[in-house]
Amino acid sequence: MANLRVEVISLFPEMFSAISEYGITSRAVKQGLLQLTCWNPRDYTTDRHHTVDDRPFGGGPGMVMKIKPLEDALVQARNAAGEGAKVIYLSPQGRQLNQSAVRELANEDALILIAGRYEGIDERFIDAHVDEEWSIGDYVLSGGELPAMVLIDAVTRLLPGALGHVDSAEEDSFTDGLLDCPHYTRPEVYADQRVPDVLLSGNHAHIRRWRLQQSLGRTYERRADLLESRSLSGEEKKLLEEYLRERDDS
């Protein structure tokens, strides 16, 4: 049995081969940790043109996805996922997805993701069936498929056994509310730039301290808003003060 079932309702199910055939998400599918199924609303139309959209009432540009094909696809997705599955619409009107939300979604047994197209979907479908709306940022995309894939990838990383190293998910950026620290690999010197000595020292306590300090400093410089919602420990405050002092002195 999969740790997580994800049912996707999309006019372009082929796009989700990026999830099922590549990288960490592909491995999770092969290991049975993630079960991914796509449902195309076109398969639930009755006219010869397989019409899934129509002009918006009130006029305006573009087309709107019709209710009935979406509802019929949702019935099949619910039958597969179970009645308790959370229905999520990927939408620029939704709350912005963050790591805290991803952690909550990773605790679900099943998710049904609605990937809209055109100018969006009929609001009556949202009112009747959607539990949550999520956005991946304040910019415009051509459809909900890419946001759905972002959500699936982020959630899959948190499934037990999905990553190659047990600590990888816990050490990712944002997991503890901070940006990630710098990473280095061989060679030790490249174009006269050396790997920081502390990473070659073998002293795990010093390495942990350095990485935490770098994460704090990067977050302060690049995403200070993240620190506003995070309570720093005494050690973290001291490390950040040292980082800023060394930066200003250099």
Curated annotation (Swiss-Prot):
It is an enzyme of class 2 (transferase). One of its GO terms (biological process) is tRNA N1-guanine methylation. S-adenosyl-L-methionine binds at residues 116, 136-141. The keyword Transferase applies. It catalyses: guanosine(37) in tRNA + S-adenosyl-L-methionine = N(1)-methylguanosine(37) in tRNA + S-adenosyl-L-homocysteine + H(+). The keyword Protein biosynthesis does not apply. It comes from the Bacteria. Keywords: Cytoplasm, Methyltransferase, S-adenosyl-L-methionine, Transferase, tRNA processing. GO terms for molecular function: tRNA (guanine(37)-N1)-methyltransferase activity. Specifically methylates guanosine-37 in various tRNAs. This is tRNA (guanine-N(1)-)-methyltransferase. It comes from Pseudomonas fluorescens (strain ATCC BAA-477 / NRRL B-23932 / Pf-5).
